[in-house]
């Protein structure tokens, strides 16, 4: 059922469909599902906010973390905080009431900040992939990734994110409630006159999903090849073999984390876009969005907690200046040094 500023995934044969801005949507799913959604959002908030805020705090506390590469990692934490503060809190609040209680303006604000955080995060991963490819594979001889390059990379993530999230605010597509009608996203659902949803969705999928996904797969594919070549050149070096396994594990986790977070949501959104008029339930879009929102937890775990330097500084901060695991970290220093010498360090 299509309204002036909403789309309900239900045929209004019984006349029960109501605006998601004004009435509870308990006719869509069991009311318990809204409680589950609220609890899930609360879980993401209590986990996502502390771990991303801790990342920012630790970086400010430890000067040695203020390196060009870590600018991009820090940008990931900022993006995740946008999602937590701007998106998860409003979704949790709306789910407690069973509908989007913040109105049309609130939908624009929530949709903008949630999408902005996701786009900044996605483009940060792409920039990080480019940085790893350039540093490890050295396609440009004598190139050194410096502060100016990092600032350019971070700026690029914001420019590309805004290029995707601002148009729906000014008339090229729009933000509407989706799934269980407690969160807002891009209008994949309608051909509403005057919004040109079709052209925007094609633009968004091409330049803000497929393109960064290609960058990530290309760069990490080349990175993996470089690690294997380095190991093949030093077959007797156990430390290099360990470095290869470490990088391989990290790359696999990066790709899996990316796909788990975004591929289900993007696939369902594209299906809805290309099959307008098909019947589907509210959970058809709500469940994939759960995976996309969980990226606020995956990102710091994969990209920061697996970084030795970040991990050491976090432990030092949490234990008030002392690292109780310092002996274990020293035992792994040989591997880290050999990894760096071979230009295959994952961190």
Curated annotation (Swiss-Prot):
Glycans are attached at residues 12, 197. Its main location: membrane. It comes from the Eukaryota. The keyword Phosphoprotein applies. A lipid is attached at residue 320 (S-palmitoyl cysteine). The chain crosses the membrane at residues 34-58, 71-93, 108-130, 150-170, 200-221, 250-271, 284-305. It holds the Pfam family Rhodopsin_N. GO terms for cellular component: membrane; photoreceptor disc membrane; plasma membrane. GO terms for biological process: absorption of visible light; G protein-coupled opsin signaling pathway; visual perception. Photoreceptor required for image-forming vision at low light intensity. While most salt water fish species use retinal as chromophore, most freshwater fish use 3-dehydroretinal, or a mixture of retinal and 3-dehydroretinal. Light-induced isomerization of 11-cis to all-trans retinal triggers a conformational change that activates signaling via G-proteins. Subsequent receptor phosphorylation mediates displacement of the bound G-protein alpha subunit by arrestin and terminates signaling. PANTHER family: OPSIN (PTHR24240). This is Rhodopsin. It comes from Sargocentron tiere (Blue lined squirrelfish). The lineage of its organism: Eukaryota, Metazoa, Chordata, Craniata, Vertebrata. The gene is rho.
